[in-house]
């Protein structure tokens, strides 16, 4: 795989594409399906019908072979969970992990740990900025949820998660830090009701502040980890069903499709 083909954000920002965004490759009995989703947690959203159609198609093409699901984020479902419940809690990732479990296909999350990613981000950004990015990114996800905890409870759990993962000494892991950084960057108080503005803050395709730069660096780190995972399983003979956000799908497409050209080159060389 030629990872240099990963599309840069400057180039990506000039592109227009559908959501969801889907493509596939097939070679020598292996299949790779990439479903680039719109981040939604409403089971009635039409993308989930399309996702189920593509999943059934994938199962038919790969019956009897080695397969794996590659998904975004953290998902924790049990045997009592329904598809609708999985979507309401985890969106498209919950849907594909649920369907994978029903088909007895293993799912994997290929991303670096929070600490590993943060250590790389610290080369260019402050702890305040990185913590703010992580918490506000979580707030945006919370705002998209149809079924959600009370905000104070969500924030408490999210802050606890990052405090345990980051292990920073002498750092104020609190929402007061988020409010302070927000005021410093934007010159105004944090307003939970200003949803449109908040949604842009951790979005890598915007240029509102340095936090968007963190988002871009984070996304690039994650993209490389995803490509490494896909390449590894492909070389081991697995068929792969990937479900990630549409931007990841679009940006990774040239690199993923280079798997095919490399196989052709290898056959010619042999």
What are these regions (language model features)?
Residues 239-270:
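C-terminal structured interaction module
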Residues 80-235, 255:
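Hydrophobic, often amphipathic alpha-helical segments used for membrane interaction and targeting
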